[in-house]
A protein has these predicted regions:
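Bacterial N-terminal signal peptides that target proteins for export
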Residues: 1-7
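C-terminal motif of bacterial Sec signal peptides marking the signal peptidase cleavage site
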Residues: 14-17
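Electrostatic cytochrome c docking/interface patches
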Residues: 19-37, 62
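Aromatic- and Gly/Pro-enriched helix-to-coil junctions and flexible linker segments
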Residues: 27, 106-113
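Gly/Gly-Pro-rich "capping" loops immediately C-terminal to redox-active cysteine motifs
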Residues: 33, 46-79
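The canonical Cys-X-X-Cys-His
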Residues: 38-47, 106
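Axial heme c-ligation environment in periplasmic c-type cytochrome domains
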Residues: 54-60, 79-103
């Protein structure tokens, strides 16, 4: 576990500042895009293709009509998740890393993508 955390921290440092170009169709969501960038989401996720994690449009498609989607995705962001998409685990982002309000913004942003 310690080795994994060290590797994750090293990756975060190495990729600091990496941000994919925002697709023009999401221009109205620039603030949410920037929040995702500042939070480090783009190290594993992006739009239009899978990276280490699933493309966000795929997440939106899977959960869009699920009445529990916001709660489910919020729980994954807080506690992390594994096995739902690919073989890699997603680390959790507790409140000390990502505020309740910012988690809500990110979940709504992800679910709004088409």
């Amino acid at each position: 576990m310690r080795t994994r955390n060290i590797l994750l921290a090293s990756l975060l440092i190495a990729l600091c500042g990496c941000q994919p170009e925002m697709p023009k169709k999401y221009a109205s969501k620039a603030a949410e895009w920037q929040l995702a960038s500042n939070t480090g989401c783009f190290m594993c996720h992006t739009t239009g293709k899978n990276l280490m994690g699933p493309a966000w449009e795929s997440v939106a498609d899977r959960y869009r009509n699920n009445p529990d989607a916001e709660a489910h995705l919020t729980n994954i962001i807080i506690n992390g998740g594994s096995g739902a998409w690919i073989s890699r685990d997603m680390p959790g982002y507790p409140e000390k890393l990502l505020s309740v309000e910012n988690r809500k913004i990110l979940v709504k942003f992800i679910l709004s993508l088409e």
